[in-house]
């Protein structure tokens, strides 16, 4: 699955054995995220990004990951649509993601830039891959706590209204065009190299009325 995913610019971001409470069947759930560098250049040339229909990234993810699941005789699940799937809980259980000091999810490879495009349930209970270290344990400066220019996102709280108010102003242009400064501040994600165009795409969906 990892090799097949790499061919479509996805990579394994974690894996876990399912529990009865998951109610998705028994087996190994493999979480998939964007493979960098090159993910955005790849998906932005797909039919979903040129047909003018809404939600191109979700539609690309659904098409591509469903094919991967079929090829592996597995089942695809997604962090969008219904029923809602607990991707954050699954990520935490994988041992490769944790809650950061600002309470956003942090990943051992992608840092605060972590995102999941989907998951594939394999029917066998496979040996799980090694997990990475919790990046925040060795992060002394913790720049994420002070990176937000208006203090909307701190270890104490996330003031969503203050965040949106800032993004409405001219000063918020850098966040809208390059992505959240808190996410960018995380040293764990500096080698992940997500391009600004992808961050801008997500910001436009987070804050569509500017």
Regions found by a protein language model. Give the residues of each.
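Non-ligating segments of multi-cofactor redox enzymes
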Residues: 1-210
